Amino acid sequence: MEGQAAETNHRAETVVRAELCLSAEQGPETTAYSQKRCLFLPMEVWQEAQQLLALAAPAFLSQLMIFLISIVSSIFCGHLGKVELDAVSLAITIINITGVAVGTGLAGACDTLISQTFGGSNLKLVGIILQRGILILLLFCFPCWALLINTESILLLFRQDPEVSKLTQIYVLIFLPALPAAFLYQLLAKYLQNQGIIYPQVLTGFIANIFNALFNYILLYVLGLGVMGSACANTVSQFIQMILLFLYIVWRRLYADTWGGWSQACFEEWGAFIRLAVASMLMLCIEWWAFEISMFLAGVLGMVDLAAQAIIYQVAIVVYLIPLGLCIAGSIRVGHGLGAGNTEQAKRSALVVLCMTELCALLSGILLATLKDVVAYIFTSDPNIVALVSYVLPVYSACLLFDACVAACGGILRGSGKLKVGAISHTVGYYVIGLPLGISLMFAAKLGIIGFWFGILACGIAQSIFLIIFVFKIDWKRASEEAQTRASERVEIPQKIDNKPSVYQEGCPTEQGDVDPGNVESIEFSQSSTSSEGTSPTPAGAAQHTRTLILTRGLALGCAVGTLIIGIVIRLSV
């Protein structure tokens, strides 16, 4: 208890130092300005908005850096020819929806677990959650590989062009080794992000994009490797991005207060992690897959509809990054508040992020609707495509308002651990309402691609109503108790202080302490009595528990490898 009290006092002092430092940076003019704004908004709301923006801006930039790697690869392939460009675009799409989306979604479990645990000051448990995430995400690489190695067969099954399918398979096979790197990057990013540390992802992502452009230029223009060169550039860029972020964490000692070394505890509590991870994955993948289905359906309508839908989709991705940044910020703030037992702050964060997200979406929608006749010229000069994009964009602008609301609610659900509700909402919204209605309007009513967006609009309205009602009915006290239960796994680490400070951000200290754990000699875990996987205090019970862990985790590894073997057999036999 004394150790916990000391840690709490230390963190409180650190927060005070950070606030004093922020006030010093702002100066008297900024302080006066803040006081004026408080005439229109309560001080707490204004401060919450500032903290959300401080997290949302770098979160937006970090997501943009990830998005640009694929875009740059497609741009460099523009000169290769139609077949090659189609193959690269198709390969990137397949990798995203069957690989990257899965890893990103699974890593989303950390939005609940790490944010709440960090908010509850159980810092060493954050490192254990990261270890569990590493092991679980690496296991999920195997079924993804099993699917990806059969890309050509799947494309031919859907009557895609044989030459395009073959080149697509080549690209995907070259990319396979990079999938674990992409997964681990997402996990490391979540590890930092949910501690309120986001700028390292922006920096490393920017450097990775420079390398990506350089590799694409050399491999495509200098060496003339074509599709293989583009795939190699993308693969190397994924490794560079992950390695740079890892090295930055080590260099700046961002791990110091949360990493206690590898422990047997990383093999425990997989059930809780996987339940959250699968729900998070479904929230992301269900939406992503729905839009990829729309691309396939647009292709059935003709080349003009396909090109217009592709342009609108690219615009939608870029515009969506703004509410996504706020969604990430809201998830962090809500998780921290609940983990710390501060329900008022969690409720305030939820309300403010909803309002801010809708305001940004409204401004973005108005801008898009105003520029509807101009946007398409960024991508093409074909008058038919430009006219169709101009016709559909106002409907998408309306969709954006509700999509942003769903995104903000999704962030609140992640921070509060209600991911299952989000997964169910997305499933019903897209596959019971949105897609059936959109497809009917596209083909039966002969509205074309605008019919699809009317379906998405109906989906957004239905989801927004449901999720807003759910968010406003959340029992925040109970959610806080659940968060503190998740973070109740105590970690005791005898440490040696070596007086090396841990640095989390340049400039001011963060909410974390700056004491280095030093050389960790041992880790002891005392699980709460409610844990389903708690260890027995007796030596015999501990030995039995270890044997059970070896058996169950070995079976998990065997199942993962088995799926890859099945995939290889299918590839060789087809």
UniProtKB/Swiss-Prot annotation:
Localization terms from the record: Cell membrane; Apical cell membrane
Residue spans crossing the bilayer: 52-72, 87-107, 134-154, 169-189, 205-225, 231-251, 272-291, 310-330, 351-371, 385-405, 431-451, 454-472, 550-570
Ranges for region Disordered: 500-541
Signal sequence annotation: none
Cellular component GO terms held in the UniProt record: apical plasma membrane
Membrane association type: Multi-pass membrane protein
The family this protein is said to belong to: Belongs to the multi antimicrobial extrusion (MATE) (TC 2.A.66.1) family.
The protein, known as: Multidrug and toxin extrusion protein 1
Gene (name only): slc47a1
